[in-house]
Structure formats: C-alpha cells, structure tokens
Amino acid sequence: MSLTIFISLATILFSFAEAISVDLNDTSSVDLATSLVADGLLNYYAGQHKGGTIGMFLPPAYWWEAGAAWNGLLNRYIATGNSTYNELVKTSMLYQSGEDSDYMPSNYTTSEGNDDQAFWGLTVISAAEANFSNPAADEPQWLELAQAVFNQQVTRWDTDHCNGGLRWQITEFNSGYNYKNTVSNGAFFQLAARLARFTDNDTYAEWANVAYDWSQRIGFIQEDYTVFDGSSIKDNCSSIEITQWTYNIGLYMAGAAYMYNYTNSTVWKTRVEGFANKTAKTFFFKDIMFEPVCEIALSCNYDQTSFKGFLTRFMVYTAQMAPFTAPLLEPLLISTAKAAAGACCGGYDGVTCGVQWWWNNDTWDGLYGLGEQMSALEAIQAPLLLKSLQVFKASNGGSSTGDPNAGLYTAPVSFANKNFENLRKHWMLLGFFLLVPTLVLY
C-alpha cells in the first residue's frame, strides 16, 4: 500500500491520542504495553478469519514475515512471562513447516527465497534456545526444524558463480535468482553460528566461517564493517549493490556474537565490536533507530517497515552473547524503546504504531501495517528481553532434540548436486553416516 496515504487526515484525527506509556524497568508495565502492540499485530493475522491459513498474515504480508512475527511474539513471552499467545505461536510454527518439515510448504515453494526459509529457521532455533514448549513426540522438534533449513541451504551453496554464496531465490523461474543477497547469506551465517553453539558441533561453525569469509571476500562486508545489500552473478559479483539495511548488519552482528560466544576468539570479538560500532553510527539519530534508506523519504515498502524490529532483536542477542557490547547497545535500545512506544498513538484504537520513531515527540506519523507493529513490539520489549533472555544450549539444559540429517531426504532433485555430496562427506568426516548409500532421483 502507499506509505503516504492517509497521513494528513490521520495526523489531524489522531495526533492528540495519548502514546503508550511504559516503564521499561517494570515487567508488568512492559507486559501491558506490548500486549497493546501485539493485539494490533494480530489484527493482521489471517488465521483468525474464515478461510484464513494458520500461521499466515493478511496480504500483502509475505510468508517470511509471518515467521519473523512469531519470533517477536515468542520474545514477548520470554521478556514478560506472559504465555497468552504461546499456543498460537507453537501451532503456527509447526503448521508452516510444511509437509516435509523443512519450511518448504507446497503453497510457497515456487515463490520462496533462501532468506524466507532462513527466517523461519532463525525462529525455530530461537524456540530451541528459549526452551520453548516442545512439540509432541510425533511432531518435528525445534532443533530438528532448524537443522533441516540449514542442511537444505548447504546443498544450495553455489560455487559455480562468484565462487560461493547463496542465491536470493531458490528456483530459477523467480526474479532474483541471479542475485546473491546479503540477507540470505547473513541469515544462513547466523543460523549456522547458533546451531554450532546449541549443539557444540564444529561442522556448523565451519559453515559459519565459510559464509562469513565469502561475504567479506566478495565485498558484502566492508573493512569498516559496513554491510551492503548484494550482487548479481551476471558479472560474477564484481559490482556490489551498496544499499545499507538495518537487518543486514544485524544478521552479521548477532551471528558474529554467537561465534564469539562459541569460540572465545579475539577475531570474532573484533568483528562484533566493528559491527556494533558501525550500527550505532549508521542507524541511529539522536540515539533512536531509523532506516536511512527509506524512512526519511517515506518510501519504505510493506516489509521494509519491519526491518528495524530485527535489528533491535539482533542487538539483544549480540549483547547477550558478547556482553562487552552491552554498554554501547543497551542505552540505544532503551532510548529507541521509549521513542517507539511514543509513536504508538494512532489509528482508531489510539495505539496503532508508526514508522518514524526518531520524531520522538509522542506523535503518530499516520503509517500503519504489520511491519510497523512488529518493529514496535521488538523495540519496546528489547530492554527487558536483554535482562530476561536465557539462551540455552544442549549442554546446559536445552531440551529440544534434533536430527543432523533433517531435510536431506526431502531435498528436491535440483539440490542433488555436488554440494549435496559435499554435505554428505562433511558429516561423515565427523563420524555421522547420515545418508543412504544411493540417492534415488525421480
């Protein structure tokens, strides 16, 4: 929808609504504030409407955005202890995992990108790390689902073009198939890093290193930790699209923090510090987060309004995994949370959230949608989440069970390439004889 529609009228009608008031140090206050925002978010939930799909939101919301939204509601539970939406979150994550429990559901497979699948993978690894209520024994488990996403994406690692990297799109018929973008590779990197920490398995860490090194070598990650958007294989990734988005740097920053936590390496510590400093310098105006590419010009599209929410989430993960970043990141999260709450004073309900938090004057900008609600939810709960989040792993109480072979038996024919063989050999080197001797192609 147009981001300029209704702005003037809305400003006149709703500019005097009272903004959401929240004491960020009080759990009950944050619970109340985020319940208002979460209720607004669920106004866009398709599953509550006749004929709607479980786990999906109303058009024009994208499938990947639904996965990210459930992660936000999961984080609300972790921060506040309020379990109101837990069953909905759990049901949605399982239903959308698809017929083969790999986040390739038949309704979306032909239009799905690697970034789309990866965001669902990040949601289920979040569930595993939080010790979220485990599915029944006859259902796929959170860790298993994350492993399925990882394994399938390894089979798509494309060394024939640009000497590595994931393409944006999975199928060649989709626009963007010839583009290797940062969000796909950054999400894969973070997922690998988190799986390494949760399972204490170096195979995942090795793939995290591969993804990071390739991203750096190709120019997605610059020497000063600027993170650009991607590149086309048509010129062998020699020309970089230099757009900078909040969620791209967040993906790499949090992934680097997980790798630091897993390895205690000074190399990863330096990288985390670099990303954190670049984030603070690039994406904050007077200590309040904003999206420079589109926010000032009011040109953010429907999903771009959600990107800031992911950066706040990833800042929390970063400060958790690499506590030396907390003195820099926590004050930014606090000031952003206050400003985001102040921007939730619009619409007919008086608590609809806008985009331009940097106004910081308890005024709604007239913009609304799923992305606005998602971002505000993540921002408002972030300071409390930082204090509440306990990131489990298998060795310290993480109860989710996995399957290192998940997702491989169901990989489409197009995945049965040299990378599939590379993955098989990689696991076998660690003593996992995971694949059947003969891969039957239909």
UniProtKB/Swiss-Prot annotation:
It catalyses: Random hydrolysis of (1->6)-alpha-D-mannosidic linkages in unbranched (1->6)-mannans. Keywords: Glycoprotein, Glycosidase, Hydrolase, Signal. One of its GO terms (molecular function) is mannan endo-1,6-alpha-mannosidase activity. Glycans are attached at N25, N82, N107, N131, N201, N236, N261, N264, N277, N361. Residues 1-19 form the signal peptide. Its EC number is 3.2.1.101. It is an enzyme of class 3 (hydrolase). One of its GO terms (biological process) is fungal-type cell wall biogenesis. GO terms for cellular component: external side of plasma membrane. Gene3D superfamilies: 1.50.10.20. InterPro entries: 6-hairpin_glycosidase_sf (IPR008928), Glyco_hydro_76 (IPR005198), Mannan-1_6-alpha_mannosidase (IPR014480). Pfam families: Glyco_hydro_76. Belongs to the glycosyl hydrolase 76 family. This is Putative mannan endo-1,6-alpha-mannosidase C970.02.
